[in-house]
Each structure stands twice: as structure tokens, then as C-alpha cells.
Amino acid sequence: MTGEMSDVWIVVPAFNEAGVIGDVITDLRSIFANVVCVDDGSADDTGAIALGAGAHLVQHPVNLGQGAAIQTGVEYARSQPGAQVFVTFDADGQHRVADVVAMIGRLAAGDADIIIGTRFGPGVSRPPVLKRVVLQTAAWLSPRGRRLGLTDTNNGLRVFNKTVADRLNITMNGMSHATEFIMLIDENRWRVAEQPVEVLYTEYSSAKGQPLLNGVNIIVDGFLRGRMPR
């Protein structure tokens, strides 16, 4: 399968994920030859473990935030010969490789520039009740997200083509990059579609995850920065 996916680059932003990053990279590498882990100033062995598992490694000397790590990873990936398809994939084990394969197939249909995962599509498990309420509220509070017909604006699993990668310029370094991603899709008129995905809420990922209200905070931050229409 890796030969068929030679034009695909997986970007994995990681911060202090030594406990799981090896398995995450190994799972990805079973399908994809090209995985770049951006070690965002981790204090543990995240970078060394990712490198040992077969990932390309780019390191930030200090923690800059997930948005900055994604931008660094995309810049690295888009500079590689033959790179045509780009994926953002969380480092904490929440995302499934099978969903990435399905999303790449959806992108190959050619009627979208970017595919975003959704936890609210048919045939997939829903998040826990409180998290579901917060995520759906965050999506409802996003004018651009509503206009684009998106149901899960904070989903970190994305697959996009080189048109998007070449123009991507994330400036919100932290978790608010999810808001900016939606803004960029809208402003650049990139064609967007959603793909139902499973998100695995393990004990580890739940402990590492953002507070429940973070989804709403991301939208509020976008308003305060003036990056979204009021």
C-alpha cells in the first residue's frame, strides 16, 4: 500500500506524547511511507521515539502551539518532491488510519480541495454527551463554518491537496488554528467536504485532551482577534 500512497504526506504535531507516539507513527507507517512528526518543544522523548518509528522529524526548540506545529509540518511536507496530498493527524491516538485512507479516496474524486473529518456523520459513534454539546455549539457559533455547511469545525483530521498546502499560512499558533483553518477555507474559496470519522476517546487521550469548553473558547478567540465575521 505504501507505494500507492507515495504522494501522501502525513503531518503529526506532537507535544509530550512519548507514551503513544511510537504506536501512532508505526500505525501510519504501515500504510504511508511519508510521515513527518513536528516535535513542538517536548520535554520528553517524543522526538526520538517518533524518529525511531520511522518518521521524518522536525523540532521546535520551544513549545509554540499546535497551529505553529501544523504550519511547520505542512511547509516541510510541501517542499518534498512529489508531494500532492497532505494530512493533519493528531499524535494522541484519537485518529484512525482507516479514516485517512477513506478521506484520501474522497479527495481523489476531485470535487473538493479539502476533506474534514466529522464526528456527527452517519455510521460513526458520537462523542460523549457533554463534549458533543460543546462541539456542536462551537460549530453553530462559527458563521463561516455554518456557511460552509460544516458540522465539526474543531476536528483535527484533515486531508487536502497541494492547492491548499501551497497557500496555507496558519498564524494562530495555539488551538485557535482550527478557527483560522475554517477562515482560510472560506476566504480562499477552497471546495470543502466532510467525511464521517471515528474518534477514539481513550483514557490517555481524554487525560491529554483540551477542556470541554475549549471548543467555544476557540471561536470566542477568533472573534476577539477579528479573524471571523461578527
Predicted regions and their residues:
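Cell-envelope/extracellular polymer assembly enzymes that use nucleotide-activated donors
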Residues: D7-W9, E180
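Short, well-formed alpha-helical segments that are part of the catalytic scaffolds
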Residues: V12-I31
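Acidic helix N-cap motif at the loop->helix transition within catalytic regions
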Residues: G19-D23, D44-A53
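Conserved donor nucleotide-binding strand/loop of the catalytic core
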Residues: V36, G47-Q80
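A conserved acidic beta->alpha catalytic loop
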Residues: D39-A48, G93
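Acceptor/aglycone-binding surface of glycosyltransferases and processive sugar-polymer synthases
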Residues: H60-Y76, V97-M175, Y201-F223
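Short beta-strand-to-loop acidic/aromatic patch adjacent to the donor-nucleotide binding site
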Residues: G82-D92
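Catalytic donor-sugar/metal-binding loop of nucleotide-sugar-dependent glycosyltransferases
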Residues: G149, I170-N173, I182-L200
